[in-house]
UniProtKB/Swiss-Prot annotation:
It comes from Saccharomyces cerevisiae (strain ATCC 204508 / S288c). The chain crosses the membrane at residues 39-59, 136-156. This is Putative UPF0479 protein YLR466C-A. Its main location: membrane. Disulfide bonds: none annotated. Keywords: Membrane, Transmembrane, Transmembrane helix. The keyword NAD does not apply. Belongs to the UPF0479 family. GO terms for cellular component: membrane. The lineage of its organism: Eukaryota, Fungi, Dikarya, Ascomycota, Saccharomycotina. It is found in: Membrane. Completely overlaps YRF1-4. It is a multi-pass membrane protein.
Amino acid sequence: MMPAKLQLDVLRTLQSSARHGTQTLKNSNFLERFHKDRIVFCLPFFPALFLVPVQKVLQHLCLRFTQVAPYFIIQLFDLPSRHAENLAPLLASCRIQYTNCFSSSSNGQVPSIISLYLRVDLSPFYAKIFQISYRVPMIWLDVFQVFFVFLVISQHSLHS
């Protein structure tokens, strides 16, 4: 069990405004909803590719959450591979895992983003997701995500 003081530190860290942007928490009672040993961050696909200074974000997370490493696995999604490769040793040292749904698949098709978002959003296995918006209104991130998922579904429908 994580010590109460460390829980408060994590709470303050997640609720505070980072120098590199704004963390949007969808659930203020998230401390009661941590699942086992996992904190999940989801960098929405659109800003992760075009708007977010990903390297600064990861360095910030690593510095902030090193003390939490014995208690949680911090998991990142939608991390462009160039950032993951550059920061692999730093991520590993802080037990930060990443999943890159943009990596090129062997058959050359666009990797399915649908399964990733459904698994992250709906599966009880994962903890509450904290979306890091970085000066982009969350409503627009949601619109981009819905549009992209719709686009992928349409492409799958056309080819099936």
